[in-house]
């Protein structure tokens, strides 16, 4: 599902927010963010290829660069400057767009919510074990899915992303949707593990960057966020101790105002009309909501 352009009377004057969802999700993930940005904002939340109502002339992508190619129409639709927001696998794609020479000049800000960029951890000895365990999980899921053990694969996938948080039973409808899209997971993992030189690319960014992590998330993504914050000049990192990996949805009431303010500040720095509903709050601590 696409959350298409929100009503705007200033054609060509505003930047556009492009929000990318997590694995096994859809663009509907961002309905609360659209509401937070307000009726004066432009937001596009596409379904990634293989999810929801997406369409692409390519086969399922095996690299993040191919994911970006599938989003070319969306990026063209945005027209001008872009604010990227991405969660989990969508965060990895957002990062790839922001560091792509074809698009980097159009990116005005970047918000990453626990992006899945595991090769970043391969570059560090102490973090290598997190990378290797995630690679083992990817191999197990691929074997399960290819062998027809889809339910087992979904259970392993959801258990991993629960991190240290409570295990909650998935609603039947959500479980069915995940089963229907399970094959896509193997491509998501392949694309994430194919991305190289993440540290160098991250250090090259010269735009406002906002990073989120949750204290109950897997150590993998918590460490990825910390590593990115360490190499991205001036990155604003926010840690929510009581949040899990799905904080983009479970803690939307906390993080969406921060994202909105981040986007507004980036537009102000660029001397452009605000892409959001004129919010300019300086939110500092998210520890307890």
For each of these PLM feature ranges, what is it?
Residues 6-56, 80:
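Conserved HGGG/HGGXW glycine-rich cap/lid loop of the alpha/beta-hydrolase fold
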Residues 20-22, 88, 214:
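Glycine-rich His-Gly loop
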Residues 30-31, 54-60, 121-124, 222-223:
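Conserved catalytic-core motifs of eukaryotic protein kinase domains, centered on the activation segment
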Residues 35, 44-85, 89, 96-100, ...:
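Active-site loop/oxyanion-hole signature of alpha/beta-hydrolase fold enzymes
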Residues 99-100, 104-144:
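Flexible "cap/lid" loop of the alpha/beta hydrolase fold
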Residues 146-186:
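Conserved alpha/beta-hydrolase catalytic His-Asp/Glu region
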Residues 174-230, 239:
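Conserved serine/cysteine hydrolase catalytic core
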Residues 234-289:
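Catalytic active-site module of serine/aspartate enzymes centered on a nucleophile-bearing elbow/loop
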């Amino acid at each position: 599902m696409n959350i298409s352009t929100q009503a705007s009377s200033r054609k060509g004057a505003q930047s556009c927010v492009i929000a990318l969802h997590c694995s096994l999700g859809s663009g509907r993930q961002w309905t609360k963010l659209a509401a937070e940005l307000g009726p004066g904002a432009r937001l596009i939340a596409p379904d990634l290829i293989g999810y929801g109502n997406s369409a692409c002339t390519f086969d399922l992508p095996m690299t993040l660069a191919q994911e970006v190619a599938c989003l070319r129409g969306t990026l063209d639709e945005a027209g001008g400057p872009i604010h990227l927001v991405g969660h989990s696998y969508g965060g990895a794609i957002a990062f790839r767009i922001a560091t792509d020479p074809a698009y980097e000049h159009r990116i005005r800000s970047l918000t990453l919510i626990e992006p899945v960029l595991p090769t970043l951890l391969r570059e560090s000895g102490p973090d290598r074990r997190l990378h290797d365990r995630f690679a083992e999980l990817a191999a197990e899921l691929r074997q399960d899915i290819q062998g027809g053990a889809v339910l087992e694969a979904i259970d392993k996938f959801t258990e991993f992303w629960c991190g240290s948080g409570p295990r909650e039973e998935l609603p039947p409808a959500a479980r069915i949707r995940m089963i229907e899209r399970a094959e896509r997971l193997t491509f998501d993992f392949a694309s994430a593990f194919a991305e190289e030189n993440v540290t160098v690319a991250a250090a090259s960014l010269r735009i406002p960057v906002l990073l989120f992590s949750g204290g109950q998330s897997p150590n993998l993504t918590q460490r990825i966020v910390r590593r990115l914050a360490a190499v991205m000049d001036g990155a604003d990192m926010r840690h929510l101790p009581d949040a899990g990996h799905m904080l983009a949805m479970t803690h939307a009431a906390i993080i969406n105002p921060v994202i909105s303010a981040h986007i507004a500040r980036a537009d102000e720095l660029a001397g452009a009309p605000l892409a959001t509903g004129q919010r300019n709050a300086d939110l500092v601590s998210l520890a307890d909501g």
